[in-house]
């Protein structure tokens, strides 16, 4: 409820103005003031009566809501307008629709409605109390105005006397003035001088610390640059690829092998033939030196040369090597070669946005170290396992020509679909045994099929091959190159299988029926020896 407004006389003139003349209090103004105050009192009384009626209505409603849920239905007279009624029935006695305000309604029970009524009754009582206070205040004012009017009527006009009071003390403090926008604060000169000296000393210290920090960072950057320039300690993909050291070791092994061959001029053909990896490497180096080609050979070329030399030894018993070196009596030097399957480098997709890449240089270096020892049937080297990811490099399945990691490395797979070095047929030991069996078969077929050549004719050729001058000056090769074709259909080239740590898919070629029958009848030396041991 708004408090009633009362008109008050205007404020007197400021003290600085000169003292005005005496202003008499007029009787009509006093009578008007009394009338306005009486209007306020009357208005308060009317409003108090209204709110008392509302309070009585809420009391009756509370009593009705408290007894309404006692019955399920009531017979009542339903009003139709202010004068028409119709008999009806009141049902759902425990459901009450409450007006929340602004035409919003909510359903509640009778007990909840009683709580709302009590809350609204408190608001009504508070409003009535406020109105009573206002009415009492204005009633006192009305009494004062009546007394004032009686005094003015009896004694005539009442004069209002006003006097100007001067202050004896001076206000020394300065009033605060609002600063202009974007203005700088003003300070005293002494304060500025002190701050300037402190700031200069602090700036010097900060500059020294900053330059010292910059010099330290430059030294660290230089050290990091020197470390990055060294290739020996580079770490990539979780594997330390010490390529320079491995290349040096490979060169040392190759040079040592060449010196051993050049120093030993004694015939040792059987020993050289038994150590196939070593002989293959030396033969490839001899071919390069005699033909005069000093070009760079990659690791893949070395592997191809090894396979070519093995095929030539198996099929022709050293004749092709003799002709390739150009030591024939009156014949043009000829190189016989055959295409081999290049081993495929494998990238294994683990399925979690990661790809395992094999270090080719590292594997080639390990293979060359193994070949330099001269043992063709050495123990199989297991891949180094440093992290859990290295385990899955050795356990891979082939599905539709693609490498898929195993869900569990403990489960076994068929040998056709597995590329694991432990379970598949492409392990190094089995490959060496199988290659040895093929070599023995080829030697037996060569001795049986070549009727025009005898053992006496092969011995001088072997002696000539052993007594070759290894330190021949390099010359350009001017002979012919002929692609070699396999004579016997029973002999299938061995599949090119890489290191067990670098799995490949061995190519499976169909074998003719005739070849299967012939190989079923013939027995190799190794198999015969095993049968004798079993017996």
Swiss-Prot record:
Residues 299-320 have a biased composition (Acidic residues). Its main location: nucleus. Residues 253-265, 276-296, 417-427 have a biased composition (Polar residues). One of its GO terms (cellular component) is RPAP3/R2TP/prefoldin-like complex. Residues 7-18 have a biased composition (Pro residues). SUPFAM superfamilies: Prefoldin (SSF46579). Keywords: Acetylation, Cell projection, Cytoplasm, Mitochondrion, Nucleus, Oncogene, Phosphoprotein, Protein phosphatase inhibitor, Repressor, Transcription, Transcription regulation. The keyword Nucleus applies. The modification Phosphothreonine is found at residue 373. The modification Phosphoserine is found at residues 372, 442. Ubiquitous. Expressed in ovarian cancers (at protein level). Expressed strongly in skeletal muscle. Expressed weakly in brain, heart, pancreas and in prostate epithelial cells. It is found in: Nucleus; Cytoplasm; Mitochondrion; Cell projection, Dendrite. Phosphorylated. Phosphorylation occurs essentially on serine residues. Phosphorylation occurs in response to androgen treatment in prostate cancer cells in a mTOR-dependent manner. Phosphorylated; hyperhosphorylated in mitochondria in a mTORC-dependent signaling pathway. Phosphorylated at Ser-372 by RPS6KB1 in a growth factor- and rapamycin-dependent manner. Involved in gene transcription regulation. Acts as a transcriptional repressor in concert with the corepressor UXT to regulate androgen receptor (AR) transcription. May act as a tumor suppressor to repress AR-mediated gene transcription and to inhibit anchorage-independent growth in prostate cancer cells. Required for cell survival in ovarian cancer cells. Together with UXT, associates with chromatin to the NKX3-1 promoter region. Antagonizes transcriptional modulation via hepatitis B virus X protein. Plays a central role in maintaining S6K1 signaling and BAD phosphorylation under normal growth conditions thereby protecting cells from potential deleterious effects of sustained S6K1 signaling. The URI1-PPP1CC complex acts as a central component of a negative feedback mechanism that counteracts excessive S6K1 survival signaling to BAD in response to growth factors. Mediates inhibition of PPP1CC phosphatase activity in mitochondria. Coordinates the regulation of nutrient-sensitive gene expression availability in a mTOR-dependent manner. This is Unconventional prefoldin RPB5 interactor 1. It comes from Homo sapiens (Human).
């Amino acid at each position: 409820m708004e408090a009633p407004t009362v008109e008050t006389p205007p404020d007197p003139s400021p003290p600085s103005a000169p003292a005005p003349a005496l202003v008499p209090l007029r009787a009509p103004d006093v009578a008007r003031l009394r009338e306005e105050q009486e209007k306020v009192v009357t208005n308060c009384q009317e409003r108090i009566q209204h709110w008392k009626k509302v309070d009585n209505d809420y009391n009756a409603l509370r009593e009705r809501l408290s007894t309404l849920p006692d019955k399920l239905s009531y017979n009542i007279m339903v009003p139709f307008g202010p004068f028409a009624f119709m008999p009806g029935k009141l049902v759902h006695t425990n459901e009450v629709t409450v007006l929340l305000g602004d035409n919003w309604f909510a359903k509640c029970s009778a007990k909840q409605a009683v709580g709302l009524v009590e809350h609204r009754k408190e608001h009504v009582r508070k409003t009535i109390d406020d109105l009573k206070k206002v009415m009492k205040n204005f009633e006192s004012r009305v009494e004062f105005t009546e007394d004032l009017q009686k005094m003015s009527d009896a004694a005539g006009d009442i004069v209002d006397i006003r006097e100007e009071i001067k202050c004896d003390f001076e206000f020394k403090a300065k009033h605060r003035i609002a600063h202009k926008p974007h203005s700088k604060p003003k300070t005293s000169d002494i304060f500025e001088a002190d701050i300037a000296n402190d700031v200069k000393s602090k700036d010097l210290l900060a500059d020294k610390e900053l330059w010292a920090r910059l010099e330290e960072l430059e030294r660290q950057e230089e050290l990091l640059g020197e470390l990055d320039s060294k290739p020996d300690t580079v770490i990539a993909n979780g594997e330390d690829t010490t390529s320079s050291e491995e290349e040096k070791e490979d060169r040392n092994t190759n040079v040592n092998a060449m010196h051993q061959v050049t120093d030993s001029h004694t015939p040792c053909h059987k020993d050289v033939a038994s150590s196939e990896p070593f002989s293959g490497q030396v033969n490839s180096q001899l071919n390069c030196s005699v033909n005069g080609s000093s070009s760079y050979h990659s690791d893949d070329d070395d592997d191809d040369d090894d396979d070519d030399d093995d095929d030539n030894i198996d099929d022709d018993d050293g004749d092709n090597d003799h002709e390739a070196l150009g030591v024939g009596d009156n014949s043009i030097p000829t190189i016989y070669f055959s295409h081999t399957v290049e081993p495929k480098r494998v990238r294994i997709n683990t399925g979690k946005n990661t790809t395992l890449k094999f270090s080719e240089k590292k594997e080639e270096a390990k293979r060359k170290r193994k070949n330099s020892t001269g043992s063709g049937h050495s123990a199989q080297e297991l891949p180094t396992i440093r992290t859990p990811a290295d385990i899955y490099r050795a356990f891979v399945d082939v599905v539709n020509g693609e490498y898929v990691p195993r869900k569990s490395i403990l489960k076994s797979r068929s040998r056709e679909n597995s590329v694991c070095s432990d379970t598949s047929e492409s392990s190094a030991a089995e490959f060496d045994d199988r290659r040895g069996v093929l070599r023995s078969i080829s030697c037996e077929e060569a001795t049986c099929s070549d009727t025009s050549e005898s053992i006496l004719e092969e011995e001088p050729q072997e002696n000539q091959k052993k007594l070759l001058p290894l330190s021949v000056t390099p010359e350009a090769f001017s002979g012919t190159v002929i692609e070699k074709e396999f004579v016997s259909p029973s002999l299938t080239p061995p599949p090119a299988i890489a290191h067990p740590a670098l799995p490949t898919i061995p190519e499976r070629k169909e074998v003719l029926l005739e070849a299967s029958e012939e190989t079923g009848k013939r027995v190799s030396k190794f198999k015969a020896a095993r049968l004798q041991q079993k017996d």
